[in-house]
Amino acid sequence: MDRRGAPVKQDSAKVEQRMEELRTLLEYHGHRYYVMDEPEISDAEYDALFRELVRLEEEHPEHIHPGSPTHKVGGQILDGLKPREHSLRMYSLDNAFGIEEFREFVERVVRLEPDAPLEFWVDPKMDGLAMELVYENGVFLLAVTRGDGSMGEDVTHTMRTVRNVRMRLNPEIEAPVRLEVRGEVIITRADFEALNARQQQKGGKLFANPRNAAAGSVRQLDSSVAAARPLRFMAYGVGQVVWADGRQRWRTQYDIMRGLQELGFAVPSQGRLCAAPADVEAAFTELSAARHELPFEIDGVVAKLNDLDLQEALGFTARAPRWAIALKFPAHQARTRLKDIRIQVGRTGVMTPVAELEPVTVGGVTVSSATLHNEDEIRAKGLMLGDVVIVQRAGDVIPEVVRAVPEERTGAEREYVFPAVCPVCGSAAVRGEGEAAWRCTNMQCPAVRKQAIIHFVSKAGLDIDGVGRKWIEQLVDSGRVVSPADLFRITREDLLGMERMGEKLASNFIEAFDSARHESTLQRFICALGIRHVGEQTARTLAARFGNMDELMRADQETLQSLRDIGGEVAGSIRAFFANGQNRELLQQFKNLGLWPEEQQPAGDSTPVTPLAGKKILFTGSLVRMTRSEAKAMAEKAGAAVMSGVSARLDILVAGDKPGSKLEKARSLGITVLTEDEFIRQASESEEISGQAADDYENSLLRVQ
């Protein structure tokens, strides 16, 4: 970044590397936040990483990976809770940091729908656990967490104990025959203070914040734990709504909120109808000033276009609705002193500077360190050791050094000189032409080896269940593990010699390593190797093309370069990795240990050719012969891309019963409309589907015939 915060032009390899780093960071911190309920960084820090990745993907679409955190909501299913699919996906929200970004959102809406009525419903953005409650004929049926948006966790047993969750809806008001209510499970500030006071009194662990307390309580296997906690459910919207006569009663977001309140749900009293975007801005300013006086924690407001037909017309992106946005409050800032800058060494040898700060409270959280990314950022921000600096938690979560305060310098400050040697092993550090990062040149550097092993077991690698960073650090530091292959040679006795390692945990580790050895896919194994410039998408391409490691290792530069998504630099990096003697020795160890996965059937270039191949398709209305998810799977197997909304780019609309406004809009745009039977027939007209893909495809057709 330059001094004005504008992005500095970067070469393709550097950009791809940074995008891979961001994906890995976001997956890791998303796991800590959504699955473990033990975040290591603030929401603002996470938002900053997320926004950087969004920007890079917009500027460099050639490096976008299908598994990017920007295409998904985030979260995973925990062992012990039953997974359950949402009938309609629970999307995340795009963020606007300030009024200007909200105005840009409004401009996008107007471009998509020039005659759109710009009336909004505005709610406080509550900081809790997103939840869906399902009612049938007015009776509570089940409760499901948001999870990854498509699949959540069944927490019916704990949500039954939440005091303001009604088991039966108000009998004096007509209720839908099926109603999916969406909202947040929260703990108020006063209840949170009382809860922690009780925890302290009985010597229990104190909760970090109300959100963690709420999330941890809901996901207990023992419902009595949740029953003892001061949980509340606050509704903000709906999923699927089915009325007995098939006619919709609610036409606006305002109707929904009023209807939910009449049925007996708690809704935020601060919600309001805004007749124009200017009123949304006023509500944002007002709630920002009053946020600390509210009974519960909020980090912004959510603005939704009020008209439900307009919401349907605008549709969704891969991760968020186009008709709603979260306006985040300004970051909390504080002054502190930059004591030192230390260097962290990553798995590829990248040396990342980290600011060591005098501890300071920012937005209720003590901050003592913050990443500085690279040497250029230190220079751009004009930082000197000993400087008074401004630190902020953007979006109230992630710490960032904003700038130095040069007017407070005393003359005792010192210029920071980026080290020319690795601080861990003492080897020379180099900075490649066109790169921002300095790297340790010693691939046997203890820090590099440790980070490589951490990556190998991580979600971005083999995703070995239960084996986290701290355990790997302990294994490496104790000398039990020197390379990733050592993980598959380790014994129970080796593990039992470690601090805080019991019999059960040691057995779980051995079982996890054994499962990884026998069940890992070729794509995951390639990712786990940590080949420079090879991320999830490139690994998928390589696995599909070569089918096994032996063939991949024999591939020459020309063959690699001919593949989709792989250019000269990436091909060269792959060849260099397999030409390295130490890497080949490690790979031979993996082979001897039985960790040598193969694809069941190399995909090659054989893909379905059907009348739907290459088409953009959308489903609307109720399907009779299959579920919506089965229809989507069939379309994708037939080579089509499934869209989320009607636009001029759409090729085909499949209309089931009661298709609604999407059918009218599709016809007005001249889009081809198919019945469900016509869709199945066209999806079945496959000319070329090979190997396992053919079996899968045929089975999907049998299910609906």
Curated annotation (Swiss-Prot):
Keywords of this entry: DNA damage, DNA repair, DNA replication, Ligase, Magnesium, Manganese, Metal-binding, NAD, Zinc
Catalytic residues (positions): 125
Binding-site positions, NAD(+): 43-47, 92-93, 123, 146, 184, 304, 328
Ranges of residues in domain BRCT: 607-696
One Gene Ontology MF term: metal ion binding
Enzyme class: ligase
Enzyme Commission no: 6.5.1.2
Reactions accelerated catalytically: NAD(+) + (deoxyribonucleotide)n-3'-hydroxyl + 5'-phospho-(deoxyribonucleotide)m = (deoxyribonucleotide)n+m + AMP + beta-nicotinamide D-nucleotide
GO cellular component terms given for this protein: cytosol
NCBIfam families: dnlj, PRK07956.1
Functional note: DNA ligase that catalyzes the formation of phosphodiester linkages between 5'-phosphoryl and 3'-hydroxyl groups in double-stranded DNA using NAD as a coenzyme and as the energy source for the reaction. It is essential for DNA replication and repair of damaged DNA.
Entry's family note: Belongs to the NAD-dependent DNA ligase family. LigA subfamily.
Name the record gives this protein: DNA ligase
Organism whose genome encodes this protein: Oleidesulfovibrio alaskensis (strain ATCC BAA-1058 / DSM 17464 / G20)
